[in-house]
């Protein structure tokens, strides 16, 4: 008989200082003793539910964490946002993956302990909220292809894309891309092309040699367009995410939260 996802995580839970309290059907409750570096132990009663081979987890009652907090990656139903499910969701079909799932839960809860002290999410490389994460991923991939400096700048929030109208060319809409406050290139948004494809590429791969023209440097002209487009969509979807939550009450456990501006 093939073990279910819940049975697999239950079979290895003791390795992660957890024990089964109840397990029936597609629901189980675990008591996890989270030990921190300072010796403090935080008991978590975790409710885990399965949907096929995928698992979701929440605190049984909001004792250690708020019941909802986008800034702390706690969904509206109280489940933990452990990863971006569309790309990174774990399919628990073996004990190896079950252990990886527990490691992910442990890392998440340790980060939550840090949030309690810092009053902000400690990891700068976190996923954006909701559908914005899809475009964040696309932007990161494009930045990576353009060179490590671009990827680092993007992760440090030093890539800014501004839309404006061209002074000439019938006021066409363009996206201007700034990296560390320096305007590097612009993109025609109606044709998805870099405005000046003859400019020197900014990827840095030429070393001491004169950089190649952007249009002739690998696929970097296309990557530059993808970065600009994805960054704009990322910001658009992030704004839509927060707009949809207008009226929800802020839990007050982080210093910066868009919900604080609400009623």
Q: Regions from the language model: what does each represent?
A:
Residues 123-263:
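Charge-rich (especially acidic), low-complexity segments
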Residues 16-20, 108, 112-116, 161:
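Short secondary-structure junctions and interdomain/linker hinges
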Residues 10, 14-87, 95-96, 162-202:
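Compact alpha/beta protein-protein interaction domains typified by the UBC
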Residues 74-144:
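Domain-level detector for trafficking modules
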